[in-house]
């Protein structure tokens, strides 16, 4: 990965130039924010998310999105009809789940935390180790993972094809011919591309509503962009560089550590490195890190404030931050201001696809 200390310093929010009056928080004055400079690699900045494009050769439609949503919430994709995509990526839990690691078929536990589906459309690579290059490729994986859905693609297709409602819906979307695993993955991915956190207090602030953030949240934004070094990895509209970093998270089993990205690349520099998750909606989905070892935002920020853990391959960006209690509190407040206020994303109601079986 190499050092990225020599980074471009750029202005992020011109609208901040007007915020010159000192803000007061209780008895403590918050320094005025006149301009926020963020060190980021290249011409990137944090801000509102851009529209999501469909992949070449796979145009989307309302019918395809609806079909994908039905499949996403349908446990028929699993071998014993108990696990759906939403079992581990629940909209009520920030499109993740509440356990340190995900739970699959027969109650088996995986080795990693469920990454969020929200804003996954912006990830250049999927999974914590980046082994899938697209949402479509990612959607195929859990179906035949023995711990997650424990099925085979062939058996799953047979089940779906024998459900009358699905047969007619696949025909309407994809035309004549047998249902394929690629079509299943394509439909699920089309739905997942609609799970975008397009609105938050932060987004409203960036769009010009200067009252959208409190004084404490503005202080947290300043820390996020400055002393907290958060934008070294959490930059861009999705607050993620899409890259892989070793944070020094202690191995739960030192004799059999999770090697992360190294398992895919075999590059020694990737040993113990995991993908940077988005900070958007992070407050909705504890616990944190790839193994769920930090139970709250407060403990997560303490972890970063210490400079991460100890590891021979620790990312050079991981350094002690020296944040005060007030600064940590402000950082938590800002992260919470990144929660989506869009009900189409935050309050998605699960579909019970039983109607397809009638």
Model-found features: residue ranges?
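Periplasmic c-type cytochrome electron-transfer domains
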Residues: 2-7, 19-358
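Sec-dependent N-terminal signal peptides
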Residues: 8-14
């Amino acid at each position: 990965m190499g050092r990225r200390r020599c980074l471009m310093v750029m202005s992020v929010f011109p609208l901040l130039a007007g915020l010159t009056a000192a803000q007061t928080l209780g008895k403590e004055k918050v320094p005025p924010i006149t301009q926020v400079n963020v060190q980021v690699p290249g011409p990137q900045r944090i801000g509102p998310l851009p529209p999501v494009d469909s992949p070449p050769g796979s145009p989307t439609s309302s019918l395809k999105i609806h079909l994908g949503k039905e499949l996403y919430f349908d446990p028929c994709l699993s071998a014993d009809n108990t696990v759906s995509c939403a079992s581990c990526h629940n909209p009520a839990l920030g499109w993740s789940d509440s356990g340190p690691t995900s739970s699959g078929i027969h109650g088996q536990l995986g080795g990693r935390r469920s990454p969020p589906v929200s804003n996954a459309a912006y990830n250049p690579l999927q999974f914590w180790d980046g082994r899938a290059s697209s949402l479509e490729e990612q959607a195929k994986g859990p179906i035949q993972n023995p711990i997650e859905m424990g099925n085979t693609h062939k058996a799953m297709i047979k089940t779906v094809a024998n459900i009358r409602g699905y047969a007619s819906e696949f025909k309407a979307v994809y035309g004549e011919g047998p249902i394929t695993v690629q079509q299943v993955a394509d439909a699920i991915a089309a739905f997942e591309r609609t799970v975008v956190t397009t609105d938050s207090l932060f987004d409203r602030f960036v769009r010009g509503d200067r009252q959208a953030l409190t004084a404490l949240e503005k202080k947290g934004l300043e820390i996020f962009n400055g002393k907290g070094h958060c934008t070294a990895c959490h930059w861009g509209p999705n607050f993620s560089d899409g890259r892989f970093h070793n944070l020094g998270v202690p191995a739960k089993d030192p004799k059999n550590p999770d090697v992360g990205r190294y398992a895919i690349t075999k590059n020694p520099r990737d040993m113990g490195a995991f993908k940077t998750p988005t900070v958007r909606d992070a407050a909705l989905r504890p616990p944190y890190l790839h193994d769920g070892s930090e139970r709250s935002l407060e403990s997560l920020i303490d972890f970063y404030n210490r400079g991460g853990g100890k590891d021979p391959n620790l990312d050079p960006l991981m350094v002690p931050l020296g944040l005060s209690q007030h600064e940590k509190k402000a950082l938590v407040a800002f992260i919470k201001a990144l929660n989506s206020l869009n009900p189409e994303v935050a309050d998605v109601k699960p579909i019970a696809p039983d109607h397809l079986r009638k």
